[in-house]
Amino acid sequence: MRYSVGVVGQPEHLAAARRLRAELSPAVYLWINAAEGRTYTDAEAADWTALDPHFGYSRNAHLSAGRACRTGESVVSVDGDGTVRRCHFVPEELGNLYDGSYRARLGPRACPLPVCDCHIGYVHLETLPLYEVFAGGVLERIPDARIPHTR
């Protein structure tokens, strides 16, 4: 079974995150999410990057308006009732999974949001190399085995 483990990068979580990294198998990727609304100094970012070499992708929101994104073409978000949206963060409905009405609205389109600050969204921006970085599992945050993720 493939899996990764994550921690929100709050200062009070750093010691526990270090212990967790020490206890996890080196084969398990420990990812650090930047805390929503938090700005990290370079020193703080270095602490988190020592645990997660890919923390830099999470550290700052990504400009996304008008940029190519895989959502709505090869990636969708589905609610329990079958409502299909291009992205978890874009409220516009494409249709319904169960009746197939979403299919006619699939296609390439630019992101309508000014910024994207969550992995489940920005991982699909075509301007970022994250499909290559997380080639082992994009949404699961499983890095490409050829890219070191521990130090």
Per-segment meaning from a language model:
Residues 83-151:
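Flexible mid-to-C-terminal extensions adjoining Fe-S/redox cofactors in radical SAM and related proteins
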